[in-house]
Swiss-Prot record:
It is found in: Cytoplasm. It holds the Pfam family SRP19. GO terms for cellular component: signal recognition particle. InterPro entries: Signal_recog_particle_SRP19, SRP19-like_sf, SRP19_arc-type. This is Signal recognition particle 19 kDa protein. The keyword RNA-binding applies.
């Protein structure tokens, strides 16, 4: 969805526990229950400008406050989501390596 000159990115797009109907990336690129802060970090790593709306609720999950990120990018949304998903996997790998130490 395009809004305010940007793409709306919901955490559910990257959640491996959600059905494909709501996920926008393949399960192999998805992570389990991504947080809004992880998505913001992934967007920062790509260098896109963004706006965070912390109290937003996804229409399908109206009972959960997930938040959303509005990303201004000059690429297709599918490319944007794939880049964010790859960065989310890197972020999770870094977090798990820090925990092992």
């Amino acid at each position: 969805m395009l809004k305010k000159n940007g793409f709306i990115v919901w955490p559910v797009y990257f959640d491996s526990t959600k059905p494909r109907k709501w996920r926008r990336v393949p399960r192999k690129l998805a992570v389990e229950k991504p947080t809004l802060s992880e998505i913001v970090e992934a967007v920062k790593r790509e260098g896109f400008s963004f706006t965070v709306e912390e109290n937003a609720k996804h229409p399908a999950y109206w009972y959960e406050v997930q938040g959303r990120v509005i990303v201004q990018a000059n690429v297709k949304k599918s490319v944007l989501l794939k880049k964010i998903a790859e960065n989310l996997q890197k972020i999770r790998a870094e977090q798990s390596s820090k925990r092992r130490r």
